[in-house]
């Protein structure tokens, strides 16, 4: 048969190989396309069936490929190539043989593995090369039959459909045999329920539904572990659990129908396995609509007939939201699955899960993880990390804390690093002094030499300790790794029924390694001086939680305890004349940091009442500065912007269907990003009454649901609302007792706000009006800020007492608080200073003295 006529009968794979063989012959300046060119092209093909056959037949692919390349180099080259190549008579003979075999097999197309069979029957140079590299005819023919699986080649893409399970699925039952699955604990009920559904006569397809991170995939891995251990009912023994790789199934599907062909090939192979394969589809909702294009089926619809007939045993896994959004819409697909709800485990169950994973993570990181660290990981993640589920978030905490310790072990200790940098500095200084000849320099050089020697000795001593510690840790990590391998081997020996080997490992090798590990740890503990941490403790877990959330969970240092005990002093340095307010806020912060505050409510919620300019907002700023070392960590919301009813949506986000739904709310987004913050609602009485309805949940439960249905945690915020209500009463009753003044103000407040709102606030605090004595201290604070601004320009400021007293006189107004004083400083001090600075009157490093001569302020 002519080659051109025959080429229409080749499969797509064989056509690609022949095209590649032609390119290879042209590239190497050969006159003809020889069998070597075709075989080389088949070897280089991605997912080549020739490679699979050669491996089954016991050949070494690397050696075969090298031998073929050497044989190609020995072929004669054309001196002046024209770029035209023809198929050689030998190649044509082989292709005719392929056609003959195809007809004998009842194939409609000629597939590439027939070329390999033709090579052996033609008995040419290529056959001798293959035999020389361990590929015997009998083994190759048997491998060809195994790959074909007794099927005829009936379409152009038949080769792509072969081994569909191997290409598009992952064997989950093989993973426990290789020791690659972490132990699954506390999910016996769900695994038993899944097995129960799998044994049903119809609708024997469980779908695991639960929030992200609760362990749906782990349940399937637990089932695979039981199948591998044969700890399952008789009907499930010997079955294979395969996970569908949807990405591989979709990748590279260039033409319409290609995806459907691949999925159909997978389903056909599963059907042929006669119930011995269980297919696991993670994120099963992605099958609804996958591969859908105009006029074609999607993957979900292709699964339905196989599920209905019972040909396909399938386990699905998806989240509650995605099940509702995708699966429930397709009722025909949904009814073929039986739901298994997977709930979030409790903190106690999570601790048990972590204890079982502990050893795996210790082996991976080469460190120790203490039991208190596991308990802390479960408890702290449950309390402080919202928006994620146990056990996933607790495992992540443990993993990151272990990674931090591992990184420290691999790095040079801080004390050695400091000495190293100091030595470099001293050596540079020594090089400079060596060039000097005067007596002072020589004395300094002598002192320097002594210091360098002392530092080098200290560094050498520390390095010796460090290297010994590193060696000890490395030794312990190696023993743990060996123990892990022995345990995997023990399980494999039990499965094989090799009880002699199992007994040797269990009662001989494992106890010996455990004893060795104990001795190593005892030696490490006995070292008097330790440079490195090699254990994850509860403190490391708390550090990671603080880093993730910004919430100070870590154990308080003595310095912080001291600061908290004297918090009033710190706040009073900036907030003058408001002792009651400062005490109330300080007590709330202390309760929280001592762990005594209600964990279901905000740290504190206060309503600050008082006239303008008395320090309500300043106290909030001071508190933010104390808690976070920055005033920027205060979420300030000006409530005068929320005077309309519809403006509530700006706080929590627009509801679905409205413009801005995807942008989130101003308040909820700010707190979601910084859960530990001071939230200030300024001028709260100016807001619409409906705004307070949204705040009721925040004040009582410490949480708020935003427009997108996400719960935002307010339990670690200090909520402060400021108001000018009753400020005229404060002025009128300034001479009366604090309680009398407060009750008069609260009457006005109760008339404006609803009782349920007032009742949820921890404390309503009335700020006093400011007296002249307070104004003097405020003037000092304001001038100190001016002094700091001038320091950046290298200028010093000194203000005489007469000048401060005059500023107080000019800026004192009982109705307006401290703000008139600020304006007086601007007008009488800052404005003249600005003119003088621009005129160049003051040079850097000079001192500006401000006085008062009885009429005007003086500047010297």
UniProtKB/Swiss-Prot annotation:
Segments for region (C-terminal): 770-860
Residues covered by region (NBD2): 560-769
Region (Linker), start-end ranges: 345-550
PROSITE patterns linked to this entry: CLP_R, CLPAB_1, CLPAB_2
Coiled-coil segments on the chain, per record: 395-529
Subunit structure: Homohexamer. The oligomerization is ATP-dependent.
Protein's name in the database: Chaperone protein ClpB
Gene symbol of the encoding locus: clpB
């Amino acid at each position: 048969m002519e080659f051109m006529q025959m080429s229409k009968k080749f499969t797509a794979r064989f056509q690609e190989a022949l095209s590649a063989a032609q390119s290879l012959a042209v590239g190497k300046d050969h006159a003809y396309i020889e069998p070597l060119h075709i075989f080389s092209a088949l070897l280089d093909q991605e997912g080549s069936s020739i490679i699979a056959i050669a491996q089954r037949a016991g050949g070494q692919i690397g050696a075969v490929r090298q031998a073929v390349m050497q044989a190609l180099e020995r072929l004669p080259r054309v001196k002046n190539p024209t770029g035209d190549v023809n198929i050689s008579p030998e190649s044509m003979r082989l292709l005719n043989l392929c056609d003959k075999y195809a007809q004998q097999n009842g194939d409609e197309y000629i597939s590439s593995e027939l070329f390999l069979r033709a090579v052996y029957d033609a008995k040419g140079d290529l056959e001798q090369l293959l035999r020389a590299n361990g590929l015997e005819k009998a083994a190759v023919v048997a491998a060809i039959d195994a790959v074909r699986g007794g099927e005829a080649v009936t379409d152009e893409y038949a080769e792509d459909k072969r081994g569909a399970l191997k290409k598009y699925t992952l064997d989950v039952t093989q993973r426990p045999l290789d020791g690659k699955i972490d132990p699954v604990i506390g999910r016996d009920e769900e695994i038993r329920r899944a097995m129960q559904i799998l044994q049903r006569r119809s609708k024997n397809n469980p779908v695991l539904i639960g929030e992200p991170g609760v362990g749906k995939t782990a349940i399937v891995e637990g089932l695979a572990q039981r199948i591998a251990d044969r700890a399952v009912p008789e009907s499930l023994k010997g079955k294979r659990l395969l996970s569908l790789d949807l990405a591989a199934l979709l990748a590279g599907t260039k033409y319409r129908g290609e995806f459907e062909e691949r999925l159909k090939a997978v389903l056909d192979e599963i059907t042929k396995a006669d119930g011995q394969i269980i297919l696991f589809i993670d994120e099963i909702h992605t099958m609804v609509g996958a591969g859908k294009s105009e006029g074609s089926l999607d993957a979900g619809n292709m699964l339905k007939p196989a599920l209905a007939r019972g040909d396909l045993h399938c386990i699905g896994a998806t989240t509650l939201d995605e099940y509702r959004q995708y699966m429930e819409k397709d009722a025909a697909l949904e009814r073929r699955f039986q739901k298994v709800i997977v709930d979030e485990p409790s903190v106690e169950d999570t601790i048990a899960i972590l204890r079982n994973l502990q050893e795996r993570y210790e082996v991976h990181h080469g460190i120790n993880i203490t039991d208190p660290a596991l308990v802390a990981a479960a408890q702290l993640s449950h309390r402080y990390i919202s928006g994620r589920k146990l056990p996933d978030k607790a495992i992540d905490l443990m993993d990151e804390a272990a990674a931090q310790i591992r990184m420290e072990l691999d790095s040079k200790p801080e004390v050695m690093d400091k000495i190293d940098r100091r030595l470099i500095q001293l050596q540079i200084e020594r090089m400079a002094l060596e060039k000097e000849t005067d007596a002072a320099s020589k004395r300094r050089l002598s002192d320097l030499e002594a210091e360098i020697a002392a530092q080098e000795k200290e560094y050498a001593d520390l390095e010796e300790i460090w290297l010994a510690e590193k060696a000890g840790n490395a030794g312990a990590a190696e023993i743990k790794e060996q123990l892990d391998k022995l345990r995997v081997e023990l399980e494999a020996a039990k499965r094989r029924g090799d009880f002699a080997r199992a007994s040797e490992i269990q009662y001989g090798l494992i106890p010996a390694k455990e004893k060795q590990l104990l001795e190593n740890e005892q030696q490490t503990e006995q070292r008097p001086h330790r440079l490195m941490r090699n254990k994850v403790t509860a403190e490391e877990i708390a550090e990671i939680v603080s880093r993730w959330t910004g919430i100070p969970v870590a154990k308080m240092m003595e310095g912080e305890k001291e600061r908290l005990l004297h918090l009033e002093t710190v706040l009073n340095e900036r907030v003058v004349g408001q002792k009651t307010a400062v005490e109330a806020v300080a007590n709330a912060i202390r309760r929280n940091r001592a762990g005594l505050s209600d964990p279901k409510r905000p740290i504190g919620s206060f309503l600050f009442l008082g006239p303008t300019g008395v320090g309500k907002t300043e106290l909030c700023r001071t508190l933010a500065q104390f808690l976070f070392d920055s005033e920027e960590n205060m979420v300030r919301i000006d409530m005068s912007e929320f005077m309309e009813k519809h403006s509530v949506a700006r706080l929590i986000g627009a509801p679905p269907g409205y413009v801005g739904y995807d942008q989130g709310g101003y308040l909820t987004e700010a707190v979601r990003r910084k859960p530990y913050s001071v939230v200030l609602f300024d001028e709260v009485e100016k807001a619409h009454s409906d705004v307070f309805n949204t705040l009721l949940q925040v004040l009582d439960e410490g949480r708020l649901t935003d427009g997108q249905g996400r719960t935002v945690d307010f339990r670690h915020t200090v909520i402060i609302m400021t108001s000018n209500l009753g400020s005229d009463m404060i002025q009128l009753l300034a001479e009366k007792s604090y309680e009398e003044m407060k009750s008069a103000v609260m009457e006005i407040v109760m008339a404006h706000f609803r009782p349920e709102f007032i009742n949820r606030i921890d404390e309503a605090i009335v700020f006093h009006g400011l007296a002249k004595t307070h104004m003097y201290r405020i003037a000092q604070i304001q001038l100190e800020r001016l002094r700091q601004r001038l320091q950046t320009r290298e200028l010093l400021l000194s203000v005489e007492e007469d000048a401060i007293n005059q500023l107080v006189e000019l800026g004192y107004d009982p109705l307006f608080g401290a703000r008139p004083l600020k304006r007086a400083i601007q007008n009488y001090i800052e404005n003249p200073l600005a003119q003088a600075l621009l005129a160049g009157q003051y040079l850097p490093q000079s001192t500006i003295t401000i006085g008062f001569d009885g009429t005007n302020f003086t500047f010297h």
